[in-house]
């Protein structure tokens, strides 16, 4: 049996798959006490099933996405060590940023020592400005992290309560600005993510579940839950990835469609082309900043069923913030869910309270509760439709999209919009009509994210670095390094070695799958030249087991 759990800002969903069928599902409200929500969802989904029958648990969450979209995280200060090159004006990240002298070259050799006094000044200034979270990032720190470690050690010595993140621990790829953003967001979200992981582990333990536990990454692959605390930002689009895989599993093989997952806090958009989710070639983008996170081409729009709706003068405005449940369920403010209740498009909550909420918006403008509800719903529909149109201009620039157009021998946008999530039934028909497309709401749409998590193939990664001149290789995920005495070590040998380590990690985490096809995420080769002679090579290889789903779920709940 497999369990899929999706922890959203509004609801926590769980599904139990038994021999390829959806045996049970549950949807409960996400409470402040996350542990109680997880236990309630597990109890409803398992319905007396013994925990020792569970073979695997996969989670997804919009927790990190919602934190960032709503900007509900503590500010993060930056200490950057960029070395020579770009003007410092290029390093603007809308937060307190201190640049100190020091530099490593691309081989990891120190070319400019740290200036201790300027380091001390930056640390003191950040503390004086009230920063309790600090990201320390140096260019080429993935090749030599000594400068980052020195600054971080001094920070922790002076201010033991300060949360410090270092760039080399977050991302091994080169590209300094992306590593800065990735490290900054990791620092901003770590505390709440660790609370999430602790709650999950406690809930599973209380229900006697001792199976391997994974969490969905932004690219639709998985990560062992204990390992995910090292890089919480990898789960930044975990929720959107889950809804995409859920739609992939709930629609016929080979379908092309736009995915619209309308939750309580956000609406997630994605694209499936001929049965395969579209991958973002440049990585996850947050507030127009690119990160090192490999992700599906998704976007989280800050509008959902629980978004605050307010009258400002003669206008009704939807804010990108959630203050709690809808007014009809005891919440403090009117929301789109209240509008749906008034229009008879949902049965959630108390109808009288929903009418009261819409009347508070509409009466000063001379509108009836029904007219105000229509106005609110149209605002939601227009916002989401406009974001889909905007996303199409980005999707159409993706290399994979262009290849799909060539293979399909046609240049037109997908004509099917698949709605999932709690708000899909109320909005998706009008959104599809606005786009001139056909609306589809598949079976199990309200718990599609949990299904997407449950059917996700477990994946593992290996990041291999080989330096034939210095005579060593290392496996980043295992913290392993070993001597290598083959000066003629080839790229193919490096790929074979990475695949071998994938097999070792699969055994370690109890994955009963053969490592045959390997997905190459990154392969880079650098020649070392001295006195016009090649003296060695550096290989950076990043591979993972293939992403995908176990199969497609039919209307009867069985996997086909």
Features from the language model and the residues they span:
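N-terminally biased helix-coil "hinge/interface" segments that flank
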Residues: 1-560
